[in-house]
């Protein structure tokens, strides 16, 4: 970013760019992505935001590539990147990596799900889950390290860390009740209270309630 005529503008290699970005339809196949990227390239749009899903199979999206702890179907991810670059050799790709977990993880850690006030579980872990954060952070590190050492790195402009419902970090289940009342969320809230107030007395004074601890 640099100032240009009194406004912050995007430059790349010294050249002014609009920063306009396209995103293929979420359930598109590799061919569908190719066609969309090609058409936008013809209109002068080189930035491409593409979603890489560890969890949700939706149409022919690029998903189900997180196979086990530390194991990934990198050829599936690379095939999607390859189609983008074939459609536009000048593509500047924003890799949107979803911080979701696959079914094998959900089966292994059912206690990490969010829970509504009515007792309904979310379909993905609570954002307060330390187990989710540690495992997804490792996945993100593994994927970015692999891509940065691949031949696709020169076309990757950046990474978008997407989480929660629809990538905007809404809590899972937010539209279906009051979340999050899971034990992991309760534990996280208690830890936050301890850090913020340090003693019961300070908490009681701040909340104007002599009964809270």
Model-derived segments and spans:
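Generic hydrophobic, helix-prone segments enriched in Leu/Val/Ile
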Residues: 11, 36, 40, 52, ...
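Extracellular structured ligand-interaction cores
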Residues: 7, 45, 81, 90-92, ...
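Hydrophobic faces of well-ordered beta-strands that scaffold small-molecule active sites
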Residues: 18-24, 48-50, 93-97, 157-161
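Aromatic-lined substrate-binding rim segments of carbohydrate-active enzymes
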Residues: 32-121, 127, 134-148
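Polysaccharide-binding and catalytic clefts of secreted carbohydrate-active enzymes
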Residues: 106-213
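N-terminal carbohydrate-binding accessory modules
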Residues: 1-41
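Short, solvent-exposed loop/turn segments at secondary-structure junctions
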Residues: 17, 27, 54-55, 99-102, ...
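Short, charge-rich amphipathic segments
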Residues: 2-9, 72-82, 188-190
